[in-house]
A protein has these predicted regions:
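Beta-strand/loop nucleic-acid-binding surfaces
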Residues: 1
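Positively charged, low-complexity nucleic-acid-binding target-recognition regions
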Residues: 142-143, 147-241
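Short small/polar-residue motifs
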Residues: 4-11, 185-186
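Substrate-contacting helices/loops that form the catalytic groove of nucleic-acid
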Residues: 7, 14-153, 224-241
Length: 241
């Protein structure tokens, strides 16, 4: 498969006791399919790194534990300032990045596989400027800056593209406060971080699942509007006679 689509030269590199082959190849991309099953909403977060509109929760507890432990270790190593401490610091940082990337790869693969199985597109939040918008306690701010929302979103998008699954981005505004059952929006709908209870209709759900359902609903509405506009701009075939 590599020889059929290989482009340019390949490099064999020995690093950290392992051999790595770096090769560039062209991969034919399928055309995005029409999401006949609607959209699969995905809410990205900190406590739970990804939650879907189907109710699947990908907890970030282990990843966050690793990051908090490494943050304490980095602080001690930085205070030492020795050459050996700096070497260990680089090693710890590299190990953490690889662990986070592996976690994001596994989560993104699960999400894309489920969307493909159910013939749905994938709906994500437009996370531009999230670091400026989100108000969090200091420990969460540290986690937010150290964990890359963009990386998981990128992994989902490119895996979906390779599978021919359309991905759409929606405005994330008030998705955490809006009821996915009746549409009522209020800050009081969130009695705590993990729970959503609508003060209007009484609908109760895991807060992240509720947000993911709102994301999916916005994607369905946006897709319908954009494709209706596309259909309206298509030229009408000329009639004969």
């Amino acid at each position: 498969m590599l020889t059929d689509h290989r482009r340019g030269e390949s490099d064999l590199v020995y690093r950290g006791g392992n051999w790595y082959l770096y090769a560039t190849r062209d991969v034919p991309e399928p055309e995005p399919t029409h999401p006949t099953g609607g959209f699969f909403g995905v809410d990205l977060g900190i406590a739970n790194i990804a939650t879907t509109s189907d109710g699947a929760v990908h907890a970030g507890k282990h990843l966050n534990q690793v990051r908090h432990r490494n943050r304490r270790l980095r602080k001690r190593l930085q205070q030492k300032g020795t050459k050996s401490a700096k070497r260990l610091l680089r090693k710890v940082s590299g190990r953490e990045k690889r662990f986070a990337a592996d976690t994001n790869h596994r989560v993104s693969k699960t999400i894309v596989t489920e969307a493909q199985r159910t013939s749905r597109g994938i709906a994500l939040e437009d996370l531009g400027g999230i670091r400026e918008r989100v108000r969090l306690r200091k420990p969460q701010r540290v986690t937010l800056h150290s964990w890359s929302f963009a990386q998981l979103g990128t992994y989902i998008a490119y895996k979906a593209k390779r599978a021919g699954i359309p991905v759409t981005y929606v405005d994330p505004g008030y998705t955490s406060q809006q009821c996915s059952g009746c549409g009522h929006t209020s800050r009081k709908n969130r009695p705590d971080q993990a729970t959503f209870v609508c003060t209007s209709c009484g609908f109760a759900e895991h807060a992240d699942v509720n947000a993911a359902r709102n994301i999916a609903a916005r994607a369905v509405a946006g897709w319908a509007v954009s494709h209706a506009a596309d259909d309206a701009t298509e030229p009408t075939p000329a009639r004969c006679g």
